[in-house]
């Protein structure tokens, strides 16, 4: 199956995230950059302001094809992940934070929950075993 992506720059970022994440899209830039600051060990040499928003699964992918070194939640180990794995991890953590903060379970919250499950299943398929283990530990950490 071919997965189509849409390149979004700074001006289109809010529109693209609004399509994927509804009213929660306005929090994406701040939360995603905070997650990167907290979890990325390697130098951040690209930006999510210029990224691919995957149209099928709805996750951000850094423009630069590279390996990113991500810290485990206990900050005792590091895992190298590719740009797709990194995008999935960061997007899922964004969704977890939004769902934890949501006060009312409305249609957009339900849509985000479904989005999380779809992307979770996709992560199982495309992530390496190390990246998937890191993904699960980070999601568990941010859920608690």
Where are these regions (language model features)?
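Charge-rich, low-complexity N-terminal segments
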Residues: 1-22
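Polybasic, proline/glycine-rich intrinsically disordered low-complexity segments
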Residues: 4-7, 72-144
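Compositionally biased, intrinsically disordered low-complexity regions
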Residues: 19-22, 37, 132, 140
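Amphipathic, interaction-prone secondary-structure segments
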Residues: 23-66
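Low-complexity, glycine/alanine/valine/leucine- and proline-rich hydrophobic stretches
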Residues: 65-73
